[in-house]
Amino acid sequence: MLSHKTQHKSIYTREKSYKCKKCGKTFNWSSILTNNKKIHTEQKPYKCEECGKAFKQHSTLTTHKIICAEEKLYRCEECGKAFCQPSTLTRYKRMHRRKKLYKCEECGKAFTQFSTLTKHKRIHTRGKHYKCEESGKAFIWSSGLTEHRRVHTRQKPYKCEECGKALIQFSTLTRHKRIHTGEKPNKSMWQTF
């Protein structure tokens, strides 16, 4: 069995039998040659989750992560998220601006894509064929009128199994159930109203 000192010496005295065809460098270990080959490719498989910057070698990513963790100099004023590169912050800020760029003039609802706004606008332009005789309020869908009529009839078909409270609309029952479960409403759901 070789002593540790002898094994260590062999690293420096051993013939470097692994040669890179691209740059001509030679290495003692095939794993180091494999690492070296990554330098010559366009592939950057190691990505920083913090700022999105990609690297060819894992060791470079590790070094970057240390710097990134220590020096988050560029902070988004809107949400507080920090980045280690100004270009990454700039890209991120664009996302905030795009978030709700297209707004409906009719109801004020905002969308991230113009095509979604266009589809939404059909709600306002489509004929409201279902009209309530009592209040004159019109609806696009018959289900909307049916649900609205319950306001006048005081019909409450949706009942909570937990406490027995009856409600006019299913959506109101869903919100009511949160009292019993302690569940908080989804923030994005409420942003649409």
From Swiss-Prot:
Disulphide-bonded residues: none
The Gene Ontology terms for molecular function here are:
DNA-binding transcription factor activity, RNA polymerase II-specific; RNA polymerase II cis-regulatory region sequence-specific DNA binding; zinc ion binding
Name the Gene Ontology biological process terms. Answer: regulation of transcription by RNA polymerase II
Source species of the chain: Homo sapiens
Question: Is the keyword Ribonucleoprotein in the record?
Answer: no
Keywords in alphabetical order: Metal-binding, Repeat, Zinc, Zinc-finger
Zn finger (C2H2-type) ranges are 18-40, 46-68, 74-96, 102-124, 130-152, 158-180
Question: InterPro entries, alphabetically?
Answer: Znf_C2H2_sf, Znf_C2H2_type
Q: Does Zinc appear among the keywords?
A: yes
- The name under which this protein is listed is Putative zinc finger protein 726P1
Q: Which GO terms describe its cellular component?
A: nucleus
